[in-house]
Amino acid sequence: MTKAPIAGNRTGRKLGQRVKNKKMKASSRQWLQRHINDPYVQRAQLEGYRARAAFKLLEIDEKYHILRGAKRIIDLGAAPGSWSQIAAKVTGSTDEDIRVAAIDFLEMAQLPGVWILQLDFLDPSAPGKLMEAVGGTPDLVISDMAAPTTGHHRTDHLRTMHLCEVAAHFAIEVLGEGGHFLTKTFQGGTERDLLAMLKQNFRQVVHVKPNSSRAESVEMFLLAKGFKGRKAEGDAEEA
């Protein structure tokens, strides 16, 4: 069971610690203070994960069991790599037998058992390179992609929803029957066409906000379970 972090740590730093730096902007100081006092950040450090985002995936899996039995996983928007760490462990991926392919336009340090591509996923060559690297049909496509924020809520929402749609189309093209798709989205409404497409192709579609996602954040996750297979999609188009 994924437990919420307790108010303490083994790093010698107490929760509630304040950041004192007069040269730092107030907003930056507040962000840093929140970050270093975040129990999920501290737990990630203790358990060897690259980011607190690991616990979002673990929480979702605890309820929906999307990692169980996964043999090949593709991770979109993977940097800094905490989801890829979990994926490599679950699949038993090694450098000799790669079963996890990850992509991000940001640089990402190497991980054992993970093939990493530094490239924008919107690049036309990205899907083919990922499929070649993962070495077979993936059981799970996970996406933590989000467009760089502009400060304009509607613009940020639309740009991130576009990434969700591209990731969803990719998942439908590559997943094996029974596979799952998980993507980050923002509160503010998921596009109807995207939801309709996912419901047409998957047996269960739900919105999820794990406890490890900050309460004040507009971040949510859209989970599509049980891919029906491309034959089902073709039948629907003919109908």
Swiss-Prot record:
GO terms for molecular function: rRNA (uridine-2'-O-)-methyltransferase activity. This is Ribosomal RNA large subunit methyltransferase E. It catalyses: uridine(2552) in 23S rRNA + S-adenosyl-L-methionine = 2'-O-methyluridine(2552) in 23S rRNA + S-adenosyl-L-homocysteine + H(+). SUPFAM superfamilies: S-adenosyl-L-methionine-dependent methyltransferases (SSF53335). Keywords: Cytoplasm, Methyltransferase, rRNA processing, S-adenosyl-L-methionine, Transferase. It comes from Rhizobium etli (strain ATCC 51251 / DSM 11541 / JCM 21823 / NBRC 15573 / CFN 42). Its main location: cytoplasm. InterPro entries: RNA_methyltr_RlmE, RNA_MeTrfase_FtsJ_dom, rRNA-MeTfrase_E, SAM-dependent_MTases_sf. S-adenosyl-L-methionine binds at G81, W83, D104, D120, D144. Belongs to the class I-like SAM-binding methyltransferase superfamily. RNA methyltransferase RlmE family. Residues 11-20 have a biased composition (Basic residues). It is found in: Cytoplasm. The active site is at K184. Residues 1-20 are annotated as: Disordered. The lineage of its organism: Bacteria, Pseudomonadati, Pseudomonadota, Alphaproteobacteria, Hyphomicrobiales.
